[in-house]
């Protein structure tokens, strides 16, 4: 199901992190036919309720000062997004060519019924296998760069690691922000997700510093 307008645009001459993520976004869309939307970097936004509680959630920038929530939903089909961690590291390999390293995660949320006609089994391992095979393909990142997969998370609270959904579930505090509705609708078959943590090390992007 897709009922939300999503505005995916790419910078003409991206640098550094934007360059790496745009390349990966494009390869995800080209290689995964079941993926409806490949978002770029997510940003951590906050909602405040009348009781003073703060709810943190990931959101993608959609242009014109608009953000789209990336919490579990069926508004724009199967989707992915990047969660990038601080800090990003720069190692002075040489004055003209420092090494740039960043860590993050690629998150997928999808509806199995939209991918497989057979619902007698749960096909999350097949999805995971397909994604990992793509991400470990030689040349998946360009130039003098290397992508390393470090961890894979599949439990719902871990997929949204670093956001309020993780805290709510780990503290057994099932209240607020429609969490009960998420339980009944999105945290069971046919919905599923993946959080694939990675690091990317590159040198060629930092050449822009020397211009």
Residue positions per predicted region:
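Small/polar-rich, solvent-exposed N-terminal microdomains that initiate assembly or binding
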Residues: 1-94
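Short, flexible beta-strand-to-coil junctions
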Residues: 87, 111-113, 201-203
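A broad, low-specificity signal for short, low-complexity segments enriched in glycine/proline
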Residues: 56-71, 143-161
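Short, charged interaction patches at domain edges and termini
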Residues: 1-38, 95-99, 149-211
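Extracellular/virion structural assembly segments
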Residues: 93-101, 105-151
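Polar low-complexity intrinsically disordered regions enriched in Ser/Thr and small residues
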Residues: 43, 54-55, 66, 142, ...
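Hydrophobic side chains in beta-strands
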Residues: 84, 108, 196-200
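A broad, low-specificity signal marking well-ordered, structured residues that form hydrophobic/aromatic
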Residues: 79-80, 104, 196
């Amino acid at each position: 199901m897709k009922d939300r307008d999503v505005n995916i645009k790419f910078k003409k001459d991206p640098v550094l992190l934007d360059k790496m993520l745009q390349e990966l976004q494009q390869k995800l869309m080209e290689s995964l036919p079941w993926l409806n939307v490949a978002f770029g970097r997510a940003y951590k936004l906050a909602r405040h309720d009348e009781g003073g509680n703060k709810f943190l959630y990931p959101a993608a920038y959609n242009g014109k000062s608009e953000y789209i929530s990336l919490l579990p939903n069926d508004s724009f089909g199967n989707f992915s997004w990047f969660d990038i961690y601080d800090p990003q590291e720069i190692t002075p390999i040489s004055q003209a060519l420092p090494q740039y390293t960043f860590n993050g995660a690629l998150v997928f949320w999808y509806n199995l019924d939209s991918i497989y006609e057979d619902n007698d089994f749960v096909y999350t391992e097949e999805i995971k296998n397909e994604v990992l095979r793509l991400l470990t393909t030689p040349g998946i990142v360009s130039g003098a760069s290397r992508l390393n997969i470090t961890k894979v998370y599949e439990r719902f609270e871990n997929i949204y690691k670093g956001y309020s959904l993780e805290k709510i579930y780990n503290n057994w505090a099932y209240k607020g922000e429609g969490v009960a509705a998420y339980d009944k609708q999105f945290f069971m078959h046919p919905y599923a997700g993946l959080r694939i943590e990675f690091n990317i090390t590159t040198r060629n992007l930092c050449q822009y510093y020397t211009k």
